Amino acid sequence: MDPIIQTIQLFQHTLHHDANVIKAAEAQLQQIKVTDGYSRILLKILASNEVDISIRQGVSIFLKNMIITKWRGAEDESPITQEDAEFIKENLIDLLVHSHHLVQNQIEAMIEIIANRDFPEKWTSLLPKSIQYINTQDVKLILAGLTSIQLGIKRFRYVTMGDKKKELLYTIVNEIFPLLLQILEFLSQHQTIESALMQKKVIKIFGYAIHFEIPDLLIQPEVFNKWLSQFVRIIQRPITPQENVKHADDCRKNQWWLLKRTTAKLLNLLFRKSATSVRSTDHSSVKALNKLFMPVYSVEVMKVFYEQLSTLEQLYKGVHYERYQQKLIEYFSFAIKYGVTYVAMKPWLSTLIQQVLFPIICFNDRDAELWECDPNEFLRSQFESSMTFATARIEVLNFIIDVVGKRGRANLDMIMGFCIQSLNKYNAATNASEKNPREKDGVLVIISVLSAYLKNISFYKSNLEQMLLLHVFPELSSPHGFLKARACSLFSEFYNIEFTDPVYFSNALKLILGLMSDNDLPVRVKAGTSICNLVRANQGVDELRPILPQLLDKIFSLLSEAESEDLVIAIESIIQRFKHEIAPYAVNLCKNLSEQFLRLLELEESDESGESGFASQECLGVYCTLLRALKDIPDVFNSLEQQIVPILQKLFTSDHMMYLDEALRILTFVTYYPKSISPLVWSLFPQIMNLFDECACDFASSYVNPLDNYISYGTEYFLSNQQYIEMVFNMYKKMVGDINQQPVDAGDCCKIMESLIQRAKGRIDYMIVPVLELACGRLLNTDKNNQKSKEFTVYLLEIIANCIYYNPLISTQYLESKNLVEPIFGLWFNRIKHFQRFYDKKISVLAFSSLLTLNPSPNFVKFGTSLILEKMLQFTKDMLSIEKELDKQEAEREQKIKDGTLKPEEEEFIDENDEEDYFDNHKFEFEFTEIPDNQDCQHDDEGEVFLDDIEKATEYFENGGDLGEDEGDNFDDQNDDDDQDSEEDLFEDEDTPDFETPIDEVDGFEFMINSIQNFFQINPTCIQQISEKQQEKIKKYVASAPARKEKLRLEKEKEEKLKQQQQKK
């Protein structure tokens, strides 16, 4: 059979209704696609207009996937042959000209993939053929030529300065950009859709060419001026009624609007590139662009954009492309930062804000349509819930925030003067027809985004109460739903101001509670989400306490209507605020939470927007907040587990990895607060361990706490199950035994193994040698691929320390039998300054002390007595200093409690992740940093550093650099100078764990004194090895031991009494 006909038939079968026929056809296609010349057959089918379009669509996707996986540079056992590759490259652009529009996107994707790997060196025909097509009078040929150049140049947009590939780009720019400029000038006379599309492609080519660095040709003043004239011409050209669409939503498909938006985006890019602070290391073209664009062009473009914004609404009657409008406004947000543009802007700044930008943020017809037809979408489109979306409204609010934050108090006063005038005008109107509720909504939005300034500047702060009473609280009863919703949000924004009469707050709170049953969903949701802040206030507690169960039920009811993460946060705030009263409602609350989470999870699996994903994540956070609130009531946990464990069982699967961190956090609380592990919670252990082995190695840090709890609070059950012990060891082996595993993750597994060794003292002798073998092997491995860090080195050495403390005889026998004593202890002593935490020092002291208890003493201990004692005494000194500092801090804390300046455990009221103090009344006075109008604002240092980092990283990789940690740190070298990083603080990025371990109950000081005395009784001659200074230090410590023992006893008694008092409470 003819291979073309056979292939067409196979693709017909892939569209069959019978799954077996489809499967057989797909299998056969997979077999024959490796045949030499098969890609030519597919290309011929695509070129034939006689073949059904559905077949050609399938073929285009199939060929594109072949090119992705089999083209030069891809890892495939049967790549496309050189002959086939040349045939494809020779005919692909021609195919773009003549193919059906339904397959053109796939053909363009093929051109881009090939160009990215071959152009220009190995696809030398792309540029000449494209230029040939562009020079014709055929629209299809010109479009194909421009498209091919666009896709070819696109590969250079992320090539950094100094890269040799840039030279290739400069050559291409010099050859084709004069032609492209001519085309742009020629197309200005043609008013067709094809003309708009071709101009857009030219603009995109220009954008790709200057993305990282502008070529020298384009920075020549005469050339640059010609290009900029064309850009401005495109922006200024009006779109006729015939060219425009009938509905604003269709603008995103209109080529004329897309052309304008693409050009505005390019001009923003030019402004950013030219305005960026010029550094001495910058390429000459960057400096040239700055000198060329900023003094004149930046202002001229801004004026053009201002004219566009001013007339956009009037000219197009609301039917315009919002993304284009957003790009116009974005330019002004940049212009604020620079003196030359801000000085030019300032004379008409108030007009820009009040007459041009303000209407954009007011409630409009589009909002009204969403309010009625899709209230959930209305909620998503609002500023409070859509910070990540690029809309004209968001851009205006960003501009207002920046013009105040970067250019000072005068602008705040100007904007607030406008707002106050508008509010007073609204209130003064006696006739409802004279009031404009939509404008008032816009004013309240501005006040909301400027709230941080208003709450921290005395003049405004002193008037906030009056503003709320006159202009906000009345709208809680407004006939306009959108104003009621806005009033809820604004009241919650100013929840913590001090009212002269508490009744004002109470009355407003009652109105908001009532609005949670309003007829309009957005009002109900905004009323519910405002509770998040209102429960934090000093006022209103008495009103909320009696209705807690009804309030929670109402918010859960709202959650079933709207997937709002803010509603979930409101529940979390209620739990935090009323944690002592929440226990009676805990089980029902947990049940509702579980139902909502499962509903949101189901929505997320079918929701491409990801909105429900945020809300479901917040639900898991509420579990944690609830469990923390109930930590002193362990009896309730058994009931809560019935609701929580089924949720965790669902989440501890490979399909729900995005929830794994939070799920393990919940498991941490469930295994920690009850101080015992129920059979139901134990059922999760094999599941989380199997998940780790399958795909969760990157989550090792999240595993540390729950596994430590399992081992610590379920020790007997854990040790009775050999399979569980093996699972923990295999986890340790998987991460420590593989030199390619990241040090951070492997270090976390060391912590888990430490927990097991300490809890199972005397019961897992058989594991000590394998554990030591893995730790020593990773420590001393000199392979350049061995992933290592200073912190990880400490963790591995602490594994060895734990093994020695567990059983010094087994450990030393292994080390001696493998000749590891010298390299391990040499490394240990050489890295002694890396043992910076109290725990690091204590476990080392316990390990060294354990060596001294052996009888007979190993030779290396006897010969190294002086060195071992030196390290022990140094660590002991450090530990005593830390203890002294902690005692001082505790004494200061107790004094503050005694003085009444600190309440016991008051810090527990606030969530550890809460960014704002619950009772922050904004008592500090905000002061602006005033910058002269003609000066640039201070540049973002982080952004500058980021640019530097890009350049350094690029240079590093170009020079063949390797990003391995601690590069060149040879563990075999015992004489390296450790002083060079002695001041380096390690473990800074780690949360200090509050593990309860058996060694907490061991006094390292007493253990050390006893072991030293024991050692010298066994080896009296060894005392001659130690210095007089060491002997004096030991005597001093021995003499102080009784007093220290009594001090610890009294502290223990005090601790027990405090614990008993807390239990009584």
UniProtKB/Swiss-Prot annotation:
Keywords: Cytoplasm, Nucleus, Protein transport, Transport. It is found in: Cytoplasm; Nucleus. Pfam families: Cse1 (PF08506), IBN_N (PF03810). GO terms for molecular function: small GTPase binding. Residues 25-98 form the Importin N-terminal domain. The keyword Nucleus applies. PROSITE patterns: IMPORTIN_B_NT (PS50166). GO terms for biological process: protein import into nucleus. One of its GO terms (cellular component) is nuclear envelope. Residues 963-996 have a biased composition (Acidic residues). Residues 958-996 are annotated as: Disordered. May function in nuclear protein import. Belongs to the importin beta family. PANTHER family: D-IMPORTIN 7_RANBP7, IMPORTIN-7, 8, 11. This is Probable importin-7 homolog. The lineage of its organism: Eukaryota, Amoebozoa, Evosea, Eumycetozoa, Dictyostelia.
